[in-house]
Amino acid sequence: MCSSDLNYIYKILDGNQTLHPVLRTDVAPYYRKLNINLMNEAAETLLGENDFFSFCRFREKATTVRKLEKFDFHRNEDGVIVGEVSADAFCYSMVRGLVGAVVHVGEERFPVSWVREVLEKRERQSESLVFAAKGLTLVGVDYPEDAKLLERANLTMSRRSSTEED
């Protein structure tokens, strides 16, 4: 089956905060303090249908064009940064690559415009950080109605250009 949307959350505890033992397996610790406003500005520049080659691990015959529907961050009541990421499909390591790039902006290593520049270069960046799998959780899969499952599967698996419409 092929989904219509995949929904992930990514939890980060920044600034060397003390990690509660219960959260140990669910949250990625990060030693620097992050600016969520800058992270959200950078994330917003990636929304829509784009070729995310720069943020994906290469896989033979796989498309890297995806439609990123949601990518934003907030801090919860425990002080944990929660990133919400939704798309029609994800390439291998794409969520971890996107979060890593936005974290670089959040720590003010690069300007907000940098993530869009990385996207448009269509090449893996040595500066780009692929975040650890710890902290990443699949929270939902939304399927299209039965009549559209095959159409959705074919679109997701086909090679497509970033100018095609869904």
Regions of interest found by a model, annotated:
Residues 1-166:
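Structured-RNA-binding interfaces characteristic of tRNA pseudouridine synthases
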